[in-house]
Amino acid sequence: MSGLERAMLDVVCLCAEWCSACRAWRPDWNVAVARHPEHRWQWLDIEDEPDLMDEVGLDIETFPTVLIARGGQALFLSAIPPQPAFLDHLLARLGAKDAAPQSVAPEAVALAQRLAARHRA
């Protein structure tokens, strides 16, 4: 793994088009994407990916939910408040070279690995 890959985070918003909170959060998400080009960003509508969600055993009930990973290793998976400052803080904490690994659910690990494999394909 190169130094660039270690520094880059994969940041995935697990959302649904029908969710008004997700739609309201999207403009702030887009601002975060523009502000942090060093990371790889994905807006993943879970309704468009039912097979993937079933495969990893993940049932998202609260939106927006964010997965943050590095090189296929899940670092964080949780619903977050739709506030840009909260996301910035999370990225700063998890993006630090000396960041302590978080305990994450096996479903988060599986999802991070599947999404990383997609990027390599």
Located regions from the model:
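Thiol-based oxidoreductase modules, predominantly thioredoxin-like and allied folds used
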Residues: 14, 37-53, 81
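Local sequence-structure signature of Cys/Sec-based thiol-disulfide redox active-site neighborhoods
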Residues: 1-35
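Non-catalytic, surface beta->alpha helical segment in thiol-disulfide oxidoreductase systems
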Residues: 62-103
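N-terminal leader/targeting and pre-domain segments
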Residues: 1-9, 88-121
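Residue-level signal for well-ordered alpha-helical positions
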Residues: 25, 55-56, 90
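Short amphipathic alpha-helix with an adjacent loop that forms part of the alpha/beta core around
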Residues: 2, 53-58
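Short loop/turn motifs at secondary-structure junctions
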Residues: 8, 59-62
